[in-house]
Amino acid sequence: ERTHHLPDIRTLSPKELSQVVSELGQPAFRAKQLNEWLFEKNVCSFEEMTNLPKAFREQLAEHFVFAVPTEVVKQVSKDGSRKYLLQFPDGVAVETVGMPSRNRLAVCISTQAGCNMGCAFCATGLAGLTRSLTAQEMVDQVVHVSRDLGERVTSVVFMGQGEPFANFNETVRALRMLNSEHGLNIGARHLTVSTCGIIPNIRAFADLPEQFTLAVSLHSAIQSTRNQL
């Protein structure tokens, strides 16, 4: 299918979107509308962009796709938490969890499909690493939960499958997309990254200008035990 080779429109920068709007013969203000639909309202199709002319939406659909994940499995627990298995267009699947409580919605996302860290107690590491996720694929997990529950996400924890600091640059990009006032606008302190302890990237994370939250999974305070785990 031809659509497999088309780029995901959400990977374009605001400048690139403006260029596309201009090339398709649309007035400049359409770029702002497009930005709002893509990154503030987080739509997953061109049909949802109701204030754009139908002909323009059809033009966009000829040039771009939404490479959003498909929900393969959803488990709902008694407390309302939902666990999803989400599959990306290339067939790679990851787990995501939505945890609603009064006036709040926390989401736990994966940063890699599989993991190379080899922690003894962790099921994810048994199969090794398939691939790292892109920042957009991390954000897509958050958007999926938000749309499924019909609620705004108030916090995100990077504690699903994978080691975020083994995919550092994309993790930081995802944090900034989630934090952006032109995106999901989640406060930096409500975005938490959990690492099993990749020291150079802990330092790099601490040097970021934003006040993102760090959680370190020590497994044990005793170094010899920790080495075994």
What spans do the regions from the language model cover?
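Helical hairpin unit composed of two closely spaced alpha helices linked by a short loop
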Residues: 221-229
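Flexible, acidic/Gly-rich N-terminal and inter-domain linker regions that tether
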Residues: 1-105
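Conserved Radical SAM active-site core
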Residues: 92-212, 222-223
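Alpha-helix boundary/capping detector
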Residues: 43, 47, 60-61, 86, ...
